[in-house]
């Protein structure tokens, strides 16, 4: 039964490594995890012996079940399900570990950390402060978050990156007169930044699925801006102070850098910069556990986030445009109420 022992030891190793990755405080800690994987005797491959034994028992139970022995139908189904579940769960654990190591390495290499709290708690806080999280008529969830600081020439900006996944559903009519409910999953990304210089203003090129909170919509004297964005605010004064010509030019250029970009400045002094671009938090794939030497080398080198900090630099540029803005250099006219 040595093959059963090997699989059991590998399961324990992966679980232990998973815990150590979660506790890692440096890349050296992650390298120790990879060393432990390299030292494991017998190879990092499951024999799937337990799954195969259960599958054979399921096949054996299926013979009398096919002959009409009703209880054996239940036995065969349970054994078959158990075999599939064990095989899939072990494969998932093996595939997910290098992804978790890579993600933690990207955090440690770039001065990021987990913001704490549960995904539900984070979503509740964000959706209460920003309209952009009011998406998905079926479900919505924060998939991942990362906290950090960006040091610019003038300001240090505290930020949290969030990955929102939401699902829309609708009824689709088929040719035969029947109908079915169709589910579509979408991803939305955001940077929530401490931004005390602007409050109660929203600039949107992409509206959430549900109706946003009722606010006045304003127009500027920049036609290109008016065609690109919906500009809302708590007051005409707040909008006028925000909508300086350099700021409007900056926002038009930002729209070329990020897809479906929105900016919401909450009354609590936070900016939610949201967009559809997953590559903002992308890093080079270090590979899998099948090539441990190559995986080790890339983790040792560290995983950069080449697209995150340029976006944060843009947020800092906006802060520089707004941090001493107390005059009303641009006329903003009340256009309509939403």
Stretches with model-predicted labels:
Residues 1-46:
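Cytosolic juxtamembrane N-terminal segments of multi-pass membrane proteins
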Residues 81-106:
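Transmembrane-cytosolic junction motif
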């Amino acid at each position: 039964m040595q093959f059963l022992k090997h699989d059991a030891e590998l399961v324990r190793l992966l679980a232990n490594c998973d815990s150590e990755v979660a506790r890692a405080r440096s890349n050296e800690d992650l390298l120790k995890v990879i060393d432990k994987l390299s030292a494991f005797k017998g190879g990092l491959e499951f024999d799937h012996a337990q799954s195969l034994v259960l599958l054979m028992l399921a096949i054996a139970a299926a013979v009398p079940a096919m002959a009409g022995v009703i209880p054996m139908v239940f036995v065969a189904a349970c054994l078959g399900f158990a075999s599939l579940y064990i095989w899939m769960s072990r494969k998932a654990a093996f595939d997910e570990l290098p992804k978790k190591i890579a993600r933690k390495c990207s955090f440690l290499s770039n001065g990021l950390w987990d913001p704490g709290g549960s995904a539900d708690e984070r979503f509740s806080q964000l959706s209460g402060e920003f309209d952009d999280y009011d998406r998905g008529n079926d479900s919505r969830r924060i998939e991942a978050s990362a906290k950090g600081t960006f040091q610019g020439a003038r300001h240090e900006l505290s930020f949290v990156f969030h990955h929102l996944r939401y699902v829309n559903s609708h009824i689709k009519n088929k040719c035969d007169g029947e109908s079915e409910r169709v589910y579509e999953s979408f991803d939305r990304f955001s940077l929530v930044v401490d931004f005390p210089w602007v409050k109660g203003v929203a600039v949107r090129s992409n509206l959430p699925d549900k109706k946003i909170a009722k606010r006045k919509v304003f127009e500027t004297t920049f036609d290109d801006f008016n065609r690109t964005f919906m500009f809302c605010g708590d007051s005409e004064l707040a909008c006028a102070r925000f909508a300086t010509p350099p700021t409007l030019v900056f926002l038009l250029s930002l729209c070329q850098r990020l897809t479906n970009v929105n900016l919401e400045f909450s009354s609590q002094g936070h900016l939610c910069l949201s967009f559809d671009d997953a590559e903002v938090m992308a890093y080079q794939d270090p590979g899998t556990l099948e090539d441990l030497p190559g995986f080790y080398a890339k983790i040792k080198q560290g995983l950069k986030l080449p697209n995150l900090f340029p976006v944060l630099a843009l947020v800092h540029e906006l802060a520089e445009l707004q941090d001493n803005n107390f005059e009303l250099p641009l006329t903003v006219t009340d256009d309509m109420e939403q």
